[in-house]
Amino acid sequence: MHLPSSLLIAAPLLANVSAEPIRIPQRDVSVVSTSQQLAVRALPDSPSGGYAPAVVDCPKTKPTLRKAVDLSNEEKNWLSIRRKNTIQPMRDLLKRANITGFDSETFMNEAANNISQLPNVAIAISGGGYRALMNGAGFVAAADNRIQNTTGAGGIGGLLQSSTYLAGLSGGGWLVGSLFSNNFSSIETLLSENKVWDFENSIFKGPKEAGLSTVNRIQYWSEVAKEVAKKKDAGFETSITDYWGRALSYQLIGADMGGPAYTFSSIAQTDNFQKAETPFPILVADGRAPGDTIISLNATNYEFNPFETGSWDPTVYGFAPTKYLGANFSNGVIPSGGKCVEGLDQAGFVMGTSSTLFNQFLLANISSYDGVPDVLIEAVTSVLKEIGAKRDDVSQIIPNPFLDWNNRTNPNADTLELDLVDGGEDLQNIPLNPLTQPVRAVDVIFAVDSSADVTNWPNGTALRATYERTFGSISNGTLFPSIPDDWTFINLGLNNRPSFFGCDVKNFTLNANQKVPPLIVYVPNAPYTALSNVSTFDPSYTMSQRNDIIGNGWNSATQGNGTLDSEWPTCVACAVISRSLDRLGRQTPAACKTCFERYCWNGTVNSKDTGVYMPEFKIADAHALDSGAVAIGKMVNVWSSVVVGVVAATLLL
């Protein structure tokens, strides 16, 4: 059934009175108030003043590594503020949900006096290139009470403000990194300004506002290459990830030249983060042990947060201060005569590290890229061979902060460099690992999955990978809900609508010191109002395509503003309070039981191969030809484009 197109053009920026599915409008600055306009971060704090790290005087108390036995003191102190800040938006969210038989006001009053009772909420945004960024942006926008109409009928506005953590990897990491690199501006603001998220020009072409034509694209790449060269001239190793991260920054960070001096650790110095007015950002990457080319579930998972970088896995089981990643750590300390370094955690470099993927695609045949002169093809081929020999297809952190750290278990303990790759290469394409750690005590994770598992739609592979990882020693005893096979996801429709996993805590058998894992609210990318299964490697999108996919993500998050399920906001609220009610030994409200019967996977399995997966629109096709519909097998190799630009620009240095 197709709804009238007039029902699809209502925007979250404009008032409406009905719970209809929305379509994000074209760019219109006039609908955004002055107070909402994009605030450029004022903390480009790299000591070099640019992309290059720099040696600095160590503080009186030199930075050290710590074992991962608990949260850092900095995170604990921040949480003491943030958890209290989530009380009012959560109170409003639960009140609007109007759960029959549940006194939300009394519940929240009790939680205000006992924070351990307060639900601890996290949001995880999967990888998947621009598809993941745009689909994830739709979810984040729908959950943000700063945006009009998110708190009306069918809305879930305030869920973002009720959340403690916001994690991303690869394309989802671009979203998280972009939000925090722009003062945690709303999606509404980012769409309405012209400084970021202009995907019409691919990374290879460069930013439109620079006035660059096909002829002078090399000037853009020359600026990228010059900044990376400064890092190398300062004595630090560089890789293709440096170029990739620099190019990404032009699209994601609203500052001149993509903010080369902006660092990830400087998020901790921003006013809204210090006041804990935002969730806690986490980006994820995988470790690559010396000599490895295939990333398995046993790979060490690393996280970047504004305070620390490291791993909870028993292999490394330690964290280094993010601000001092480039320091000469050995066995957890900076030895006498060792140097402190700041600026290695450049924001684009961290986002690029979480999204390398180059070890899979750089050796592709670039001769198919239209318009590349033969001389450049020859030069690129030469560079690719050198990259393969030097293993520069990964993100390198040199010196390795975990040198001589946990020598018995750490695969990189005796290497001078720490090699990191795309956070989804171990198939855990949703950044769940940091959020399932018992010390973080997360109750519910809203897992937004934009993976390209089957015809560029997800089929639960990312969840299943995290579940299967719990059977190995690498999980360190961390539990995760049971996840069925891929065909069960498809045949039961678990990948075509929100699905809950781990609803009944009685299904978990706990050994000593184990804790019940979070409830997982799985929100898969599906065709609500757009064919949002665009290729991971599509390098550019029209404004209409971008907005349609973001609008589709909104409709996924809200079930079409309640069009598909008017009780969806109630079910979201039930997921939020579920673990808290279990801890308190209280009965599940009847309305929540109804929700759980509707959305919880009940253990049924149907593994029959039913052929090619081609889902139909769940609401209506909002401009089929304009939505970015993908032809299966289409692949635009943006990675080759990046390398071509890098080589060409380097020739001009």
Swiss-Prot record:
Enzyme class per UniProt: hydrolase
Cross-referenced Pfam families: PLA2_B (PF01735)
Protein name: Lysophospholipase
Function: Catalyzes the release of fatty acids from lysophospholipids.
Catalytic reaction list: a 1-acyl-sn-glycero-3-phosphocholine + H2O = sn-glycerol 3-phosphocholine + a fatty acid + H(+)
InterPro entries associated with the record: Acyl_Trfase/lysoPLipase (IPR016035), LysoPLipase_cat_dom (IPR002642)
Annotated keywords: Glycoprotein, Hydrolase, Lipid degradation, Lipid metabolism, Secreted, Signal
Single GO term (MF): phospholipase A2 activity
UniProt source species: Neurospora crassa (strain ATCC 24698 / 74-OR23-1A / CBS 708.71 / DSM 1257 / FGSC 987)
Enzyme Commission number(s): 3.1.1.5
Signal peptide range: 1-19
